[in-house]
Structures are given as C-alpha cells and as structure tokens.
Amino acid sequence: MHIKMKDIFKAFGQNQVLSGVSFELQEGEVHALMGENGAGKSTLMNLLTGLHKLDSGTIEIDGKETYFSDPKEAEQNGIAFIHQELNIWPEMTVLENLFIGRELSSKLGFLNNKKMKALAKEQLERLGVSISLEKEAGDCSVGQQQMIEIAKALMTDAKVIIMDEPTAALTEREIEKLFGVIRALKKNGVSIVYISHRMEEIFTICDRITVMRDGKTVDTKRIPDTDFHEVVKKMVGRELTERYPERQPNPGRVVLEVKQASKKGVFQNISFSVRSGEIVGISGLMGAGRTELMRAVFGLDPLDSGDIFIEGKKAALKKPSDAVQKGIGFITENRKDEGLVLDTSIRENIALPNLASFSPKGWIDKKSEQEFVDLLIKRLTIKTESPETHARNLSGGNQQKVVIAKWIGIGPKVLILDEPTRGVDVGAKREIYQLMNELTDRGVAIVMVSSELPEILGMSDRVLVIHEGTLSGELSRNDATQERIMTLATGGR
C-alpha cells in the first residue's frame, strides 16, 4: 500500500495544528515520524485513519484519493493504528480483547472459540509472547498489554500499521522480538509508520524519517543520510549541545533510608539510602520489582516487612497520605491512570495535593490557589492556553510537567520519579532533567526509576540495580556503564 498525504491543514477552533503538511509512505518501508510533543504527528495519523476530518489537502492511497469516515473503516481497508494509550479492556480476557468487535462464529451462529484460540495462539507465538488466553488483560503487565495490542493489529491482516510509541513499556527482549516482527512484516510488503522519541530505535529499525515541528513538515530523509544531531536540531529548531545537563551534586544528610524491605513474591530484603541533593537511579529489567518497591515506599502497597526512615525517624507509611505528610512525592510510570485526573483542569490537578494549604479556614482561597498554579505553570514552562484546559488535551511532555508541578507544590523532601520521561520528546526531556537538577540544588532527594540506560547514566549520582526482586549491586557514577548495569540486571556479577 502506497500512501501520499499532501498539503494537509487542520485546526481545532482557533488552534492551527497542521499547516501544509506532506507525508509519503511507501510499500514495505518502516517510516519514522518524529517531532516534539505537540508537533502534530498523532493528529496527522488521526486524519489518515478518519478519526478527524481534514480542513484541506489530499490523501491518496495507491494513487486514488481516499478519505475514511472513521478508524473502523480505515482498519477494514488495511490500516491499523496502535495508539500510545492502550485500547485494552482490563476486565476481559486476553482472547476477548484480541477479537473484540470481530468475533468468529460457527455455521450455527455460536462463537467459534476453538478457531479464535488457535489464531490468537499463533499470533502471540509469532510475537514470541507467552500469555494465557484466559488471563484477564488487567492482570497483564503494561509490556504484555502492549504486545496484545500489536497482536490485535496484526490479526486484521493490515497492510499499514501505525505504531505510536510502541516500545515505551517493553523490556529489551520484548523490543528485540517486536523488531523481528517488524522486519518480517516489511518483507511481506507491510508498511509501518513508527512514531517514537527513542532515537536509537529509529536508527535501528527505520528506513526513512520525516521530522515535524510546530504543525509543519521540516524534512524527510533516508536514515543512512542523517544522524542524531541533525534530527534533534530539526525537531527543536535549535542545537541541543548536550543530551543531559551537567550535574554538580553536593549530597547532604540521609533523608530516606529503607532497611530490609520485603514484599512476598515481589522483592526481598532490599536496603538503600538517599541523601539530600542526590539522584539515585534504580535500574533493572521489567518485572524486577523496581516500581513495586517505590509503590511500597509511597504507601500504595505497604511492605510485608522492613522499615522506612525519613530524616532518621522511623515512618509508618501505610497509605499515600502518610507519605505525603512526611514529604514524599511520587510521579508514577502511568501518568494517565495514576498521575492525572484527565477530565479536570490543569489548575485542579496541580492544586490537588496542596488543597490544605489553600483552605486554612475550611474553604479554598481561590486567589492563593490561582497564584500558586500560575507560578508553577510558568516555572515548568507548561504550554497551555489556560490553566482551565483539561489535562487530557495536553501533549505527553506537558502532561508530565503537570504531574511534576503537582508534587513540587508540596515542597517534597523526597521525590520518586518512575519513568520520568516516558513518551516525552527530546526538548521536554531536557527541561525535566534541568528541573531535577534545580530540585537537588535545593536539597530534594530524588529516586529515579528508568528503563533507559542512557538516562540512568546521564542523571544518576549512584545507581542501584535490582534483579528478580533483590538488590544485585550498587555503582557510583564513575563506575556505572551500560555493560556493568546489564550484567547486574541479568543476574551476573
């Protein structure tokens, strides 16, 4: 399938999102679509698949002008879109999720479970994934849910698959499996639009790259004809001299200390400490127990045994409000479900953990609240027309900034960041890193969980590595390398 989008314009109200964008997808190619959050990448693909109607411009498929009325029609015509926000029904089984809306029936009109199971098993095996078809999708890891989405798209016999941040929650092994599937699809003439902020992946798996900025097409190039620095410059319109800002740590006293922390079947006897002004990175493979440990420290899933000390005093953290009272903030890996109330305003989201400070007499002082929110929006350079804009309508990078603003507002002693830049563009990543430096300069102790090794190496003063629920090693900034971390993460010494 050959797709040609030419001179595309699209506005939402007064907001001009796309201005004269052109994009071409050739048969059997993997084409990267890159740009900062808000550049218009997802909007362009939503126009292609019929979710939105374009204002002007043309879309040609195999030389014929074609416009779909909705995504289902696009799917029926061979174009599947795997969104960054997974379209998973958590209470339904893996099998039901794979066939929802396109169930197979026998000649008598009954559901043909036998055939559906066989097809589902075949597709998951093709992806190299082992998941019980009877398991509820909500009980699957985020990585497994992502694989279910990919399998669902492949089962439609799509000729074009749009993948929006497909590896954001996948392990290294799962990424390699996905790349193997992409290469096989490519050989069979399937075209892939690959939307990602992970530059290493783009240069590994893609044939061409189109860069967008501020709703316009900047350039399209073959991967061998460009490099990381050129792409970043075209994305942000400026040089990013260093990927990670320089750190000059000056650690103070121990603020957070965890001793012999255990949760049955998840992690065992983990001890570590974090000092004021320090960033401690926590690395390990998906499923190692990193996030679960942080959730326990924050009181979301309390420890079975072990102790937590804040500034030398034992703290009973049985629920998140206990942690907040002790000065702990937690930015979760899943900002959409746990970090934000999507259908409320930026103002309400930022103010939420801080309501007590605006309500000394039992009612909210609206003026104080607004001044507080405006200050944080300005400080974190959150791009929005109004504090009353719903969080759902922000780009990924700006949503993450709102989550960070929410917790900065409590004046934390300890800030836990779980995958702080997942799904965030290069420019916004650097802003988040600079903010982390500002916080540590003010004495905040930061614990950062990340699956991106360059991020761990670029921002951590110390690195803790977790393997299968145990602390397998601790490395200083000078001793930490990708090879050393991966050795410890896979059980080596």
Curated annotation (Swiss-Prot):
Its EC number is 7.5.2.7. ATP binds at residues 35-42. SUPFAM superfamilies: P-loop containing nucleoside triphosphate hydrolases. GO terms for cellular component: plasma membrane. One of its GO terms (molecular function) is ATP hydrolysis activity. Pfam families: ABC_tran (PF00005). Residues 3-239, 252-493 form the ABC transporter domain. It is found in: Cell membrane. It is a peripheral membrane protein. Keywords: ATP-binding, Cell membrane, Membrane, Nucleotide-binding, Repeat, Sugar transport, Translocase, Transport. Its main location: membrane. It comes from the Bacteria. The keyword Plastid does not apply. It catalyses: D-ribose(out) + ATP + H2O = D-ribose(in) + ADP + phosphate + H(+). The keyword Hydrolase does not apply. The complex is composed of an ATP-binding protein (RbsA), two transmembrane proteins (RbsC) and a solute-binding protein (RbsB). Part of the ABC transporter complex RbsABC involved in ribose import. Responsible for energy coupling to the transport system. Belongs to the ABC transporter superfamily. Ribose importer (TC 3.A.1.2.1) family. This is Ribose import ATP-binding protein RbsA. The lineage of its organism: Bacteria, Bacillati, Bacillota, Bacilli, Bacillales.
